[in-house]
Amino acid sequence: MTTKIVNIVVAGGNYAGLNAMRHLYATLLASPVQANKTVVNITLVDRRDGFVHYIGMTRGITEPSFGSSLWVPYSTVDWLQHSQITIKQGTVADIQPTLVQLTNGEQLQFDYLVVALGISRFAPIGIRSSTKLEFVAELAESYAQLESAKSVVVVGGGAVGIELAADIKCDFPHKSVTLVHSRALPLPGPFKDELRHNVVDILQNSIGVELVLGQRVIAQEPASADMADTLTDMPEHVLSTATDATLTLSGGQTLHGDWVVRCLGTRDKKSIINLPSSTQEPIFGANGIRVKDTMQIDDVAYPHIYACGDICSRDTVKLAGVAMYGAYIAAINIARTISSVSNDSPTLEESPLYPSKILLLMSKDHFIMQLGDEIWEKEKTRQYVSDDMGLQGSINGLSLNKVPAAYSPFDLAPAF
């Protein structure tokens, strides 16, 4: 029997991409496909040389010693050194039906693709670095500006802006910290106003952050780089900070900040997804790549392409845990298809729709959570809170410190 070679590309690392890699390894490499004489090669494409625990970035800026632990180099992960795994450090420029092209011109042909490229933010919340050494240096740069500032203004009252303002004020209680948000209450999204009012109370009365709500920043002098370069494909390389800046608000008020950081939303990766739709519906919708419950792209032309994590349309609120579960579904469905010894298509797993959820970590002592329509009590929420902002849990969950156990893709995983 002729040996069949199957090439899988996972575009993007972190929570979704690495969990896809973990389950592809456990189902296809740790227990090699024997019955149909298949050799599987898996390529991970990531512009960084390691995993970054993005959830901890706000505290990584205020506590650089903690921040340096957020980056786990791929070279330290034993199972990623498998002979049938290739780690390609590079940036994806274009995704077509059978190939991924990198910005250096290299093309990677695939039989199966997992798109896990996430979404982008401007630096320093978005990560400019491609190596841990660069990451540590950039954290130190942000920390130096923060440490020398007497007054800090955070613009944008989404989850990241809220957590950053809280971490700064708690780690530097003598600094003036102001959070500016354009709406009457912070935290956009499908959440209750009761939750938003609780957030306001915690920030103002428990932590001491000054809030300016219902006003937009209409001018900033000097402007930060992101204000002039909002159309870039790589916002992570553009700083959203300014020093010694004056902000003019829509209500006529002016604010001064020795250090100003703008946390104003995300940018998608629509420009690199060049997959013609076979219907009138675009492949990339308003909330990301349209996917089925199986995590396959929702188009009959692309049963071999999966998308998971923040880049897909699956969930309104983008969460690391949901990204990991979607990646698990994608990986086992690919493994089932490859491992099937009959000509019949195997039954594919489907991902359930999860209720919206948010857990806000407002420094080490203050946190709040809404799951679906329920706002959880603090003591009930505490079980999901750790001093390291979930770092060790993510390392364990992604098997970055151990080799994943082999299992059959036709069985449920020991843990997703």
Each predicted region: which residue ranges?
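Eukaryotic N-terminal targeting leaders
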Residues: 1-7, 25-39, 80-83, 223-241, ...
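Beta1-alpha1 glycine-rich phosphate/pyrophosphate-binding loop at the start
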Residues: 2-86, 166-191
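C-terminal, flexible cofactor-proximal segment of oxidoreductases
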Residues: 13, 317-322, 326-416
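FAD-site-proximal beta/loop scaffold in flavoenzymes
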Residues: 132-150, 254-325
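Rossmann-like dinucleotide-binding core of oxidoreductases
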Residues: 151-155, 159-203, 209-212, 321-349
